[in-house]
């Protein structure tokens, strides 16, 4: 499974890690994913969702 948000599709991005002497090293920036129970297509499923989707209210939590 790829490291992506299952709601918005946000994934890993490559970039550079620069030191004080301006040496460059490749690295990956990964989204802050949280495992949450979410209602998807009428069913309760466990999904990996980024914190931006959680804060903005894109997720609908299942009724207990």
Swiss-Prot record:
GO terms for biological process: translation. One of its GO terms (molecular function) is structural constituent of ribosome. One of its GO terms (cellular component) is ribosome. Keywords: Ribonucleoprotein, Ribosomal protein. Belongs to the bacterial ribosomal protein bL28 family. This is Large ribosomal subunit protein bL28. It comes from Elusimicrobium minutum (strain Pei191). The gene is rpmB.
């Amino acid at each position: 499974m790829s490291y992506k948000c299952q709601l918005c599709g946000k994934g890993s991005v490559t970039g550079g890690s620069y030191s004080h002497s301006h040496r460059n090293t490749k690295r990956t920036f990964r989204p802050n994913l949280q495992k949450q129970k979410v209602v998807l297509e009428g069913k309760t499923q466990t999904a990996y969702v980024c914190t931006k989707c959680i804060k903005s209210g894109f997720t609908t939590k299942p009724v207990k």
